[in-house]
Amino acid sequence: MAFLKKSLFLVLFLGLVNLSICEEEKREEENKEEEDENEALSEVKRGFLEKLKTGAKDFASAFVNSIKGT
C-alpha cells in the first residue's frame, strides 16, 4: 500500500511540474507575441511620423514661397 501511495504522489508531482513548465512556456510565448505586436505598431508610428514631418516641411516651404510671391 505504501508503494502505491509513493507512486501516486510521484505521478502527481511530475504532473504538476510538467503543468508548471507548460504554463511558463505559454506565458513566454504570449509575451513574445505582444512584443512583436508592439514592435510592428512602433514601426507604423515611425513611418507615420516621417510622412507627417515631410508633409509639414513641404507645407512650410510652399507657404513661404507663396508669401514671397505676393
Curated annotation (Swiss-Prot):
The modification Lysine amide is found at K68. Residues 1-22 form the signal peptide. Changing F63L: In frenatin 4.1a; increase in activity against the Gram-negative bacterium E.coli (4-fold) and the fungus C.albicans (2-fold), and no change in hemolytic activity. Changing D58L: In frenatin 4.2a; important increase in activity against the Gram-positive bacterium S.aureus (gain of activity), the Gram-negative bacterium E.coli (4-fold) and the fungus C.albicans (16-fold), and gain of hemolytic activity. Changing T54K: In frenatin 4.1a; increase in activity against the Gram-negative bacterium E.coli (4-fold) and the fungus C.albicans (2-fold), and no change in hemolytic activity. Expressed by the skin glands. One of its GO terms (biological process) is defense response to bacterium. Keywords: Amidation, Amphibian defense peptide, Antibiotic, Antimicrobial, Cleavage on pair of basic residues, Immunity, Innate immunity, Membrane, Secreted, Signal, Target cell membrane, Target membrane. Belongs to the frog skin active peptide (FSAP) family. Frenatin subfamily. Frenatin 4.1a is a mutant of frenatin 4.1, it has the same peptide length and is non-amidated. Frenatin 4.2a is a mutant of frenatin 4.2, it has the same peptide length and is amidated. This is Frenatin 4.1. It comes from Nyctimystes infrafrenatus.
